[in-house]
A protein has these predicted regions:
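Core segments of alpha-helical transmembrane spans in multipass integral membrane proteins
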Residues: 14, 18-22, 42-64, 79-83
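Non-cytosolic membrane-interface motifs at loop->transmembrane helix junctions
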Residues: 35-43, 97-108
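Membrane-helix boundary connector in multi-pass membrane proteins
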Residues: 86-103, 121-122
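Hydrophobic alpha-helical membrane segments
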Residues: 74-88
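Hydrophobic cores of alpha-helical transmembrane segments in multi-pass inner/ER membrane proteins
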Residues: 51-60, 109-120
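Structural signal for membrane-spanning alpha-helices in multi-pass inner-membrane proteins
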Residues: 20-23, 60-64, 88-91, 116-120
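Membrane-water interface at the C-terminal end of transmembrane alpha helices
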Residues: 111-131, 135
Length: 135
């Protein structure tokens, strides 16, 4: 279980780093399905927030490398990713659907955190509960 969780976190860190760097250096036109040429303010904000996305990826990588010592951060990683999916859903409800390639991204942003938390719960919380009950 621990190695599965570790590899999921490494994969998440890699995808996040690639997409973060892509937007940081490519701006709005680097987003899949973009028609290019975004307003300067939108491009500016996207590049700014891409740095936080990169930091999230680095954090996922750090937790994966030190998973036994840093397991307590796993629920936060899952929660942030899930809330990102909620952000996409709010956008769809507010301004309409994005490019079709981003719909699977939103679905993954709901599914992956649930899987991460499920593995976390089974590996860490369940064991802690067993130990405190003396079984």
């Amino acid at each position: 279980m621990e190695s599965t969780l570790k590899y999921i976190l490494y994969a998440l860190a890699l995808v996040v780093a690639i997409t973060g760097l892509n937007v940081l250096f490519g701006g709005a036109s680097a987003i899949p399905g973009s028609t290019g040429g975004a307003e300067a303010t939108v491009d500016n904000e996207l590049r700014f927030f891409s740095v936080f996305w990169l930091a999230y990826g680095a954090f996922c990588f750090w937790v994966a490398q030190n998973i036994q010592a840093q397991y307590k951060f796993i629920p936060s990683i899952a929660l942030v990713f899930f809330i990102g999916g909620l952000g996409r859903l709010i956008s769809i409800l507010s301004v309409g659907p994005p490019a079709s390639v981003l719909i699977p991204a939103m679905i993954l942003e709901f599914v992956i955190p649930i899987a991460i938390y499920g593995i976390y719960w089974k590996k860490y919380i369940k064991n802690i509960t067993k130990q405190s009950c003396g079984t």
